[in-house]
Amino acid sequence: MLVKVSIENFKSFDCATELTMISSNKIRTNANHRLKIKSTQLLKYGVVYGANAAGKTNLVEFFRFFKECIRKGIPMEAAGMFCKNREENKERESGFEVQITVGDKFYAYGFSAILSKRKITSEWLYELYQNGSARCLFEREGNKRPILDSAITLPNTEKNKFEIYADDFEGNESSLFLTEMNRGKKYTVRSKLLFFKEVYDWIVTHIAVITPNTPLIDLEYYYDTDSLKLINKLIETFDTGISKVKIEEISLDELSNAMPKPVFDKVMRHVKSRIEEQENPSFRMTMRSNESFFNIEVQGHEEPKVTTIRLDHVKSFYDFGFEEESDGTRRLFDLMDML
């Protein structure tokens, strides 16, 4: 889970800015919105409010940028991503750090860079403990050789491999060592270097940036009778004019006609893949594009059941399709799982 992020000299973030998911002791209701890992209470969800140009989009952009750096290196466009509020920021270090949990372990991984030069100046990974202490697993400064925690004792074979990786990486100012340690490297479950894989895998698989233009997402929405009652209760609290949300079954042909062929083919490959993974397949998935909303339910090896939503309005004799609603109303359905 995400614990905390820290951003400095990036887009609209000039000074170091933090977002924390650690729950306040003052929160005593909605216990199901929290998760306890060891002695730390973490929030499952977070909502960011702010006026226009307050930096909300740039927070999302940070997650996209951070993941991209880990996967492929600092992108070309990063040269202009430093905070432009002050002239000196062009040559000033930018800092990025995420604190996460993997299993019951807490990690802090980050790096600093001069974005205008796409030059990495430092990188670090710490394991954090409940008593407030931390252990540096590895760090690097500038183009120097990465240094492993001296307390980590490796078998000779693994030690020799790491020494080669670290020696070869010396002088590298354009790549992250975390990335290098996951480039075709294999780790056993007992390897004392497994933290390289754990942190890398978490970042590339658990950071998912979904924007209004994201064409397809896969969510666990269950629009059966019980969930429809809850959704209708929630929708009443918003001034949308919607009086009722209901589902309507459609055929696979209708689904095919409602979306571009490449998208439909991708969806069906995904459904087929999930069916093949299970001996007795049973799952539901929701697809949400900018103007479409479909649910696919699979029970056994029968043809998938496809439904879409229709909406009744207070002052209309006819129902409306999801694509006929305003963008703001459509975005409400993206938040239903959190609400």
Model-derived features: where do they sit?
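Conserved ABC ATPase signature
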Residues: 45-50, 268-339
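A short, sequence-level motif marking secondary-structure junctions
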Residues: 20-25, 112-117, 141-145, 323-328
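Short strand-coil-strand connectors
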Residues: 8-11, 101-105, 314-316
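Pre-Walker A-like glycine/lysine-rich segment at the N-terminus of P-loop NTPase domains
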Residues: 1-65
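Electropositive, glycine-dotted interaction segments
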Residues: 108-267
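Short beta-strand segments that buttress and anchor functional surface loops
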Residues: 96-101, 125, 311-313
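Short, mixed charged/polar active-site loops
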Residues: 14-16, 106-108, 133-135, 317-320
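Conserved P-loop NTP-binding catalytic core
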Residues: 34, 41-47, 51, 60-118
